Amino acid sequence: MRKLCVFIAILCLACGTHAATVWIDTDVSIGSPFREVDDAFALVLAFHSPEIRITGLSTTYGNAPLGQTTRAARDLVQRFGRSADLTVDHVFAGAGSASDLGRRSGASDALTAILQKQKVTYIALGPLTNLATFLQLHPKMANRIERVIFVGGQAPGVSLAFGPTRSFHIHDANVFKDSAATGTVLRSNIPLTLVPTATGSHLLVDGADLRQLERSGGAGNYLSHESRIWLWFWTHFVKTNGGPIFDALAIVPMTRPELLSIKKRYARMDEAGNLVVTPRLTNGARTVRDCTGFALETKRFVLRRLQQAPRKGEAPAEPLGR
């Protein structure tokens, strides 16, 4: 309770800005070998973006277990959150698995406290269990969420395959891990923008990009150092031209939307639990906005933002003892 009170007090002090108010839900796993790093790229991009004001972060399972994602989120905020006026008191643990759907958590309590005071855009970088739980617990507050931006959705029959022979396949992870939660959010009729994995797979960083980030110091150096094994996996095992930072693209609708191709589409849950997106209205579908592509400038924009110099008081980029 004390932590929640401190969090609300910090929030009230920050309410004077004109930046868009967002809540970010993340399964960040940077710092562990062979884990995805794209959530961390997305979070640092958000920290460095004056167009948005982050009112809180919730953690969820997905890329790693909840305890690990919560530690990673707090570590990242402690290092680089100062630029966004964030402290570890802004990070709340949520669902540990799909079986936690509907179960109250620190994340659901904190989001409720926020929405009692103001509306937010909810950016979901992981499975939708936390948001669906909130909607089940507080259905009358759904209209307090102005929009959901979600990394998920796919065209029917499309396989997410990578590499020169298209032999490395992945599923639509955030949907796959809790399709029931995805269905709950879809039925809520909150305005929904989808940033599909298939689209984000084209936003690649390579060795030259990591060296550029390393030279910039601060958060860029940290991301570069912690992404080396991840990049090796994508370039040597999957044999792509770089590593995809899927989740970073989900921040761009709030910062540089003109860089994106966003089209009106229709989404529904199919019998297999997939979030299917089509250009034509089908039975049981609802309208969504779908990110189908992005301008070449998008990668340059992301890299520039990641390289912003840390403000006075930010933690050093060298890895802390784990």
Stretch-by-stretch model annotation:
Residues 1-4:
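Positively charged n-region of N-terminal signal peptides that target proteins for export
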Residues 6-8:
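Sec-dependent N-terminal signal peptides
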Residues 11-12, 126:
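Hydrophobic, well-ordered secondary-structure segments
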Residues 14-16:
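N-terminal signal peptide c-region/cleavage motif recognized by signal peptidases
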Residues 20-56, 60-71, 84-87, 98-200, ...:
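Active-site histidine-anchored catalytic micro-motif
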Residues 20-21, 41-49, 53, 173-176, ...:
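Conformational coupling and interaction surfaces
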Residues 24, 65-116, 121, 271-277, ...:
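Metal-dependent C-N hydrolase catalytic cores
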Residues 80-81, 138, 255:
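A broad structural signal for alpha-helix termini and local helix breaks/kinks
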